[in-house]
């Protein structure tokens, strides 16, 4: 947990602090077309200081059986996985009303 996050949460336990951080984020899931018509699912709006993007990207890639990466504060997954990503993020504790799928 970063120093900035602990200063925001004061003396709260790390688990509770992490949950509060998740509830305050607005996550956008969108689809981009790349070269040769390939589709890439983009997940934006996650705060790198509050969520471990590398760990989250790894979890999403394994659960979706796809390739992907994280860079520039966003996660990129190969293929169109917008609706499934939303379901997985809700299972992981992110509030459904804070996850927006851009059609």
Swiss-Prot record:
The keyword Protein biosynthesis applies. One of its GO terms (molecular function) is translation initiation factor activity. InterPro entries: DENR/SUI1_TIF, SUI1, SUI1_arc, SUI1_arc_bac, SUI1_dom_sf. It comes from the Archaea. Disulfide bonds: none annotated. GO terms for biological process: formation of translation preinitiation complex; regulation of translation; translation reinitiation. Keywords: Protein biosynthesis, Translation regulation. Belongs to the SUI1 family. HAMAP family: SUI1 (MF_00604). This is Protein translation factor SUI1 homolog. It comes from Hyperthermus butylicus (strain DSM 5456 / JCM 9403 / PLM1-5).
